[in-house]
Every structure is written in structure tokens, then in C-alpha cells.
Amino acid sequence: SCNCVCGVCCSCSP
């Protein structure tokens, strides 16, 4: 599994 990392496992808004 992978933790929520912006651009890796999920998308994050700036």
C-alpha cells in the first residue's frame, strides 16, 4: 500500500 502523497498515490490541490 502507499500513503497519500501528492502526485504519487493521490491528487492534492495547492
From Swiss-Prot:
Q: Which residues carry this modification: Cyclo[(prolylserin)-O-yl] cysteinate?
A: C12
> Position(s) of the covalent cross-link Thiazole-4-carboxylic acid (Ser-Cys)?
S1-C2, S11-C12
Crosslink (Oxazoline-4-carboxylic acid (Cys-Ser)) position: C12-S13
Do the record's keywords include Secreted?
Answer: yes
Q: Give coiled-coil spans as residue ranges.
A: none
Instruction: Tell me the residues on which N4-methylasparagine occurs.
Output: N3
Position(s), cross-link Pyridine-2,5-dicarboxylic acid (Ser-Ser) (with C-10): S1-S11
Kindly list the biological process annotations in GO that this record carries: defense response to bacterium; killing of cells of another organism; negative regulation of DNA replication
Q: Where is this cross-link: Thiazole-4-carboxylic acid (Val-Cys)?
A: V5-C6, V8-C9
Q: Which GO terms describe its cellular component?
A: extracellular region
Show the cross-link location (Pyridine-2,5-dicarboxylic acid (Ser-Cys) (with S-11)).
S1-C10
* PTM characteristics: Maturation of thiazole and oxazole containing antibiotics involves the enzymatic condensation of a Cys, Ser or Thr with the alpha-carbonyl of the preceding amino acid to form a thioether or ether bond, then dehydration to form a double bond with the alpha-amino nitrogen. Thiazoline or oxazoline rings are dehydrogenated to form thiazole or oxazole rings. Maturation of pyridinyl containing antibiotics involves the cross-linking of a Ser and a Cys-Ser pair usually separated by 7 or 8 residues along the peptide chain. The Ser residues are dehydrated to didehydroalanines, then bonded between their beta carbons. The alpha carbonyl of the Cys condenses with the alpha carbon of the first Ser to form a pyridinyl ring. The ring may be multiply dehydrogenated to form a pyridine ring with loss of the amino nitrogen of the first Ser.
Residues the record lists as Cysteine methyl ester modifications: C12
Q: Where is this cross-link: 5-methylthiazole-4-carboxylic acid (Asn-Cys)?
A: N3-C4
Q: Show the cross-link location (Thiazole-4-carboxylic acid (Cys-Cys)).
A: C9-C10
* Family label: Belongs to the thiocillin family.
What is the recorded name of this protein?
Amythiamicin A/B
